[in-house]
C-alpha cells in the first residue's frame, strides 16, 4: 500500500491495508503477553474435539466422502469473515482505503472502506493518569462482500456464503499500576449475523438457506490479570491468568446437525520472560478448553465432550 501522512491532518492509506478495526481489542494490551495470550485461538484448527477419547466427526452420508472431523474452532466461528478466530474477527488485511486522525489529548479515530463492500470505524485512547497506564478502544466492522474470505471454507469443505451481511463490534481496555506492575486487561465482542450460505454443501447433507439465516448473533468476552516486574536483569517478567467465554459462535453448517447453540470456555496461566538485549520474549503457557453444543440434535452426539488441555512454549524476536 501507499500512504500520505501529515502531523496536522492525519494519515491516508490506499492498497492492501490493515483495516481500522483489525486486531483493535488485542493491540491495547500493554502487558507484554499480547502474543503469548490473547482472545485469538491460534490452535483452533489444530486441536480436535473428542468425546470419551474418540474424535468427534460429522455423520457420513455414504457417498464415499472423507470423514469430517470437528476442531475446537467449530465453536469459535466469526460470521463476518468465515474464520475460526473469535473474538479477533478481522485478522486479515484487505484492499481498501483507510484514514487515521491525529491524536488529540490521547484520543484518535480511524475509518476504512473497501469495495463490494466493507467498512469499519474505531476510536482509541491511550494515556497515563495518577500512576496508572490506561488504553482503550471501541470498533465496529461491517462486511457484505460474498467473495471475501471464501478460501478457508473451500479448503475445509464447508459452505460458502450466498449472501453475506454481518457486523462485529469489539471493545478492549488495559489498565496497569505503574509502580507495582499489576495489570488488568479485558475485551468484549458481539456479532450481528444475517448471512445465507450455499444450501448444498453442509457435510453433503443439505442445509436449507433459510436455516443458515438463523445463525445466532454470538458474543465473546475475555479477561486477563497479572503482574509485570523487573525481577531479573534480563528484562521484565510477566505472570498472568486468563479466562474467556465464546457463546453461540458455532459454524452455521452445524445447524444441519440440529445445533442451535454453543459455548466454549477457556482458562489459562502463563509466564513471559523478556530479554531486552536480544529484543526477545520467551513464554510458557497452559490453556484448558471446555466446549458444549445445544439443540435438538445434540443428545448422544455432541454432549459430554472432553476438555482439551494445551501447553505451548514459544519465542519471538522483534525487529
Enumerate the language-model features and the residues they cover:
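Detector for outer-membrane/organellar transmembrane beta-barrel domains
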Residues: 122-274
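Membrane-spanning beta-strands of outer-membrane beta-barrel proteins
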Residues: 92, 104, 116-118, 165-168, ...
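Outer membrane beta-barrel
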Residues: 1-120, 124-130, 135
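Extracellular/periplasm-exposed beta-strand and loop segments of Gram-negative cell-envelope proteins
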Residues: 31-71, 75-88, 149-151, 158-168, ...
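C-terminal closing repeat unit and adjoining cap/tail of repeat-based domains
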Residues: 270-291
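Active-site-proximal beta-strand/loop segments in catalytic clefts of secreted hydrolases
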Residues: 15-18, 113-115, 139-141, 187-189, ...
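Outer-membrane beta-barrel "beta-signal"
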Residues: 307-319
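Membrane-spanning beta-strand positions in outer-membrane beta-barrel proteins
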Residues: 11-13, 108, 135, 181-183, ...
